[in-house]
Amino acid sequence: MNIIRVKDVEQSAEKALEIYQNAVQHGAKVLGLATGSTPIPLYQKLATSQINFSELVSINLDEYLGLDGEDEQSYRYFMTKHLFQYKPFKHSYVPDGKSEDHEAAIKAYDRIIVEHPIDLQLLGIGRNGHIGFNEPGTSFDSTTHIVNLTQSTVAANARFFEKESDVPTQAISMGIASVMSAKKILLIATGESKAEAVAATINGPITEDVPASILQKHSDVTIIIDEAAASKL
């Protein structure tokens, strides 16, 4: 693991931008993208950068079940709002949250990942150590699957909705094995609320109780953490 400590959120985004610039310059063609509040500062920098994404493919980690891409709370909408409207990709894949045939949607997404091996996978981390929507207890061998969100994850995401009861309780997510198949992984963690998860990921045992701990086994992982997120290392 390559651990990069920075002062604050702004510096974390600047360092992440450098990693993206370097990856694309060295031929990265497929970028795995994440949602949530953590990557927004990076996306703001990517949106105004000189990087040309028009020949690249993006693959997102997850999507809420039951929301289509026009819904303002969907992750497709999130990506359009924060990045895609400024930097279009050749193809942008997000799981189909509205498909009534979940098994078909899962197989289709797994096929996309196999056909487009991810060069650089971006991750955030949940307070409970989840990556994507892979909650504690998720098998390290998992591929794309339907997830029942934990109460802590629902509560953490409630700030994006009018009220907590509006937060979907299920999602379709790339699995941990899918994430680990990426050539390079970049995890960004900022804020004191992520400090325990960061410590468990870097220094704790590798356990499905802390999904992100599996990153210790990946050959090319960079973790960018600000002072607050590093406070329990």
UniProtKB/Swiss-Prot annotation:
Name the GO terms of the biological process aspect.
Answer: carbohydrate metabolic process; glucosamine catabolic process; N-acetylglucosamine catabolic process; N-acetylneuraminate catabolic process
- Give the source's domain of life in one word: Bacteria
Q: Which Pfam families match?
A: Glucosamine_iso
**Family annotation (InterPro entries):** Glc/Gal-6P_isomerase, Glucosamine6P_isomerase, Glucosamine6P_isomerase_CS, NagB/RpiA_transferase-like
EC number(s): the record gives 3.5.99.6
Catalytic reactions of this protein: alpha-D-glucosamine 6-phosphate + H2O = beta-D-fructose 6-phosphate + NH4(+)
Gene3D superfamilies per record: 3.40.50.1360
The Gene Ontology CC terms held by the record are: cytoplasm
The protein's name is Glucosamine-6-phosphate deaminase
Q: Which organism is it from?
A: Leuconostoc mesenteroides subsp. mesenteroides (strain ATCC 8293 / DSM 20343 / BCRC 11652 / CCM 1803 / JCM 6124 / NCDO 523 / NBRC 100496 / NCIMB 8023 / NCTC 12954 / NRRL B-1118 / 37Y)
